[in-house]
Design a protein with these regions (language model features):
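Conserved phosphate-binding/catalytic region of the ribokinase-like
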Residues: 1-93
């Protein structure tokens, strides 16, 4: 798997299955700090993949984690991540 975090432009995932997924936010909030946002994308994606074995759901969670972290001064809380999740849109390319 190859996961590319693209900041405000979302993320791309090339899954080992050969499918390509794109994550975007339908609405965004002001960025407070990008420190740790990429790491949060990776951690959220891995947690989601281990939990569900579903690439689209894992990418959605990873994108929400990274975005929520960027919207805060420190790492995002679970509540913050859950608030961002509905705004994450996944498409298959």
């Amino acid at each position: 798997n190859v996961l590319v975090s693209m900041g405000a432009d979302g993320a791309l995932l090339l899954a080992e299955t050969g499918r390509v997924y794109r994550a975007r936010l339908r609405s965004a909030q002001p960025v407070v700090s990008t420190v740790g946002a990429g790491d949060s994308v990776t951690a959220g994606f891995l947690a989601g993949l281990l939990d569900t074995e579903d690439y689209a759901l894992a990418l959605r969670l990873g994108t929400a984690c990274g975005s929520a972290t960027a919207y805060s001064a420190c790492l995002a809380s679970r509540d913050m991540i859950e608030a961002v999740l509905p705004a994450v849109e996944i498409t298959t390319l």
